[in-house]
Amino acid sequence: MTAVESGSKVLRMKESDAQKLLAMRCHIGTRNQSSAMKKYIYGRTAEGSHIIDLHMMWEKLILAARVIAAVENPKDVCVCSSRLYGTRAIYKFSQHVGTSFHGGRFIPGTFTNQIQKKFVQPRVLVVTDPRTDHQAIREASLVNIPVIALCDTDAPLEYVDIAIPCNNRGIKSIGMMYWLLAREVLRLRGTIVRSVPWEEKVDLFFYRDPNEAAEEKAAAAAAAPAAEAEEGFGWVERNDDNAWEA
């Protein structure tokens, strides 16, 4: 029995949360496995991909949420994602939780070079992938900043203090993990109550290709005149009983 399961019932994973994680394939890892992540693996699929234990995933997510909620100033928590698919998720997470965020390439010296223009000293660092965010993790280790990381089955855990085992390569999986993490932080702070579902849609945490969004917008704009033209040929009933008019 895990620490979360043996503790308060409030923090236990609900069936609806488990269904969300399964639907977004948060439990499907890679075909590779690092020795440090072996304890989080439940089994393998027929295709050879490793399956992550949902209970251990939830336990670490709750632990990470408690750490973030305990930081007095939310801006002292820095969320990073060098992986493109995670930029939208960390932006929405920071928007709701109030943390600082850094998307795209991490500039060397951000945590260690005090004369740098964008120098910051966060109290907690959250990263999307220990591999792509290795520079941020390395600098955090030099200045004693605790690190929370979304870790796939092949992730290295060097300098990672809290590893949340999950699929950190899928667009929907990354969005779901940050959505759940944001929700739990807000619940622990008392900003939202557990008895009422969070109104924020998880879809807003999913990365969208700018080109795809522009194409959809252009298609909608092109379809609008055609729809208006069709409406113009409708029939309107007159007040008198003699006829109909176009």
Swiss-Prot record:
Keyword annotations: Cytoplasm, Ribonucleoprotein, Ribosomal protein
Pfam families the record matches: Ribosomal_S2
Origin superkingdom: Eukaryota
One GO BP: ribosomal small subunit assembly
Compartments where found: Cytoplasm
Similarity section: Belongs to the universal ribosomal protein uS2 family.
Physiological role: Required for the assembly and/or stability of the 40S ribosomal subunit. Required for the processing of the 20S rRNA-precursor to mature 18S rRNA in a late step of the maturation of 40S ribosomal subunits.
Protein's name in the database: Small ribosomal subunit protein uS2
